[in-house]
From Swiss-Prot:
Purpose of the protein: Involved in the gluconeogenesis. Catalyzes stereospecifically the conversion of dihydroxyacetone phosphate (DHAP) to D-glyceraldehyde-3-phosphate (G3P).
Location (main, coarse): cytoplasm
Name the UniProt record assigns to this protein: Triosephosphate isomerase
Annotated catalysed reactions: D-glyceraldehyde 3-phosphate = dihydroxyacetone phosphate
Pathway: Carbohydrate biosynthesis; gluconeogenesis; Carbohydrate degradation; glycolysis; D-glyceraldehyde 3-phosphate from glycerone phosphate: step 1/1
Cell membrane among keywords: no
Record keywords, A-Z: Cytoplasm, Gluconeogenesis, Glycolysis, Isomerase
Gene: tpiA
Record-stated family: Belongs to the triosephosphate isomerase family.
The EC number(s) this enzyme carries: 5.3.1.1
Sample GO molecular function, one term: triose-phosphate isomerase activity
Amino acid sequence: MSARPKLVVGNWKLHGSLNGNAELLEKIKAAGQTRAALAVCAPFPYLAQCQSVLAGSSVAWGAQDVSAETRGAFTGEVAASMLSEFGCGYAIVGHSERRTYHGETDAQVAIKALRALEHGITPIVCVGETLAQREAGETELVVARQLEAVLESLSVEQLGHIVVAYEPVWAIGTGKTATSEQAQAVHAFLRGRVAACDAGVAQRMPILYGGSVKPDNAAELFTMADIDGGLIGGASLKAEDFLAIGRA
């Protein structure tokens, strides 16, 4: 286990309701200190609710995406400047579901990360391979390509303000989880790629694991030297499970 602080981020995806969110957020807020720092990334309509309910607490909140554009005729887009106006702390960029269903490219993800940073928002940059790519032995090739697009677009100073999340696509929402050793190997590889830019930044950078993290496997994953927490999907919708992961 590393000395880096742990971070556990809940990605609610396309889930939530005003009443349900209020109950979930209040339970998380009332739980007190956990081993890991906690954050929740909610759908855009609920960000103001997160801001209100979590005000004054140690729980951070963020968005699940951010536009690569800054302003203009881009219907449906939400700019980083808009998010930052009311205190958004994080923005997920490059999630595999955005890459797969919305055709986002590595270059677009890099621009989104830059837009977030320009407005004081920490981008959570997601990388990960499909099952076919893993079975073809292309895991490192794929995640390196995805990460390098971001590394090449940012200064060393900016790199010190991002979070990376490794999310093997074959383990998202499938119930399958990479073994702790498989995940650690990719995390170590990713940290090595960052170290090629700056060793100090690499040593400090949080690299999260995302892929069917649950209370019963979080502790083992989080003991790995280069796994600094988790990007949590389904388990983040239940306060008890999310908090258990935060305490792992």
